[in-house]
Amino acid sequence: MLIKILVISNNIYILKKSTMKVFYLFAAVLLVFSCKTETPVKEISIKEDVYFLADDSQEGRETGSETEKQSANYLAERFKNMGLAPKGTDGYLQPFTFKPKTNPHGKATYNINKEDSTITGLNVVAYIDNKAENTVIIGAHYDHLGFGNEGSLYRGEGAEIHNGADDNASGVAVMMNLAKRLKGKNTNNNYLFISFSGEEMGLLGSNYFVKNPTIDTKKVNYMINMDMVGRLKDDKSLAVYGVGTSPKFSQTLFANNSDFKLIEKESGVGPSDHTSFYLADMPVLHFFTGQHEDYHKPSDDAEKLNYEGMDAISTYILDIITDLDNDGRLAFRKTKNESEETPDFKVTLGVVPDYLYDDKGMRIDGVSEERPAQRAGMIKGDVVIKVGEYEITDMMSYMKSLSKFEKGQKTIVIVERNGVPLALEVTW
């Protein structure tokens, strides 16, 4: 197989795919020579970022892997070369540790005790400091499924690299493009850019950042997330989630749209990293071009993406940010959860579990409006320890307990609130 070497600020990256012709000039321009005059840094396109991240050499960017570290270092160098300041806990990096924990969703659970941890993920965090009062967070997860493992929809024999071009090299590349375009512009806000890891295992990186922020989250204006924005179709359908999380969003989306068939979703809860910020009472917008047959399969490759569409999405998001730049701090508004997964059971409490919780029970990270949990009086932070006669020790036992009930039945759910047990009557 043809091998290519990419050098960025003296870091060497090995590229394996024979389709990587776009990087010949890229590597030559970014090679840093040890001489008095530094070689100018070439601007990297959305396509070039995708082709790097989705190359076979990155082996699917699985959280905790050596190639995840390589991808993280690449992104850190990209931020550095654009002149963004580091805002992690270790330069541009924010490590977090966790141990895998099997449950019906194939997620993992964060473990705050490092001595018991088995895996370390890396968020990559960079900052544009405009000396403004508020900060806009712009994020996209860069991890994927590695060679498949849990979460893969591939049914072939043997392990194959899942490159995750759309999911989510596309979102990261658009985020990088926005970082370049926002440098020195729209200075009424600061901008924090985060490449999350651990999304595929249960929003681990974003959840960790929200609970261990490197900026004052009370000064966060709003958060924009991009996950799978690389497959814009001919009808230009673009889904935007979280539109109801601030009164300003709907009109702003409409006023700046001339190209897209917008599919607006009110809810701030969904299967991507914006959820972590919404649950911390921050307005969020999440952009998504839709599902496709290559989702979570080895066939999600870079050559299948719509790069003109990604450029257009980047411009649209920039226009939205520009429009909101003079509006000050946006108001936050809670929404109904429109995106609950259809479970294998007939009833659900209507809560968002805290997948990072590693103690006894199931801790609630969010409560959906007008659902059984809210009607019964449950709140964020409650720990469910018993459902009817069934003891809840972890996520698995919680899921199993739900299969024992029918819609319309009533039962007592015991929760711990600030260490005090409470018995609440739930109507399913």
Residue map of PLM features:
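N-terminal capping segment at the start of a domain
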Residues: 41-70, 82-90, 222-231, 293-300
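A non-catalytic alpha/beta surface segment that caps or lines the substrate-entry region
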Residues: 61-127
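Alpha-helical metal-binding/catalytic segments enriched in His/Glu/Asp
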Residues: 126, 138-139, 149-202, 317
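Metal-dependent peptidase/peptidase-like ectodomains
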Residues: 196-286, 306
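His/Asp/Glu-rich mid-to-C-terminal helical/loop segments that flank catalytic regions of hydrolases
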Residues: 293-339
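PDZ/PDZ-like groove recognition
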Residues: 336-380
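Conserved PDZ fold ligand-binding element
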Residues: 375-395
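PDZ-domain C-terminal substructure recognizer with occasional recognition of PDZ-binding tails
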Residues: 400-428
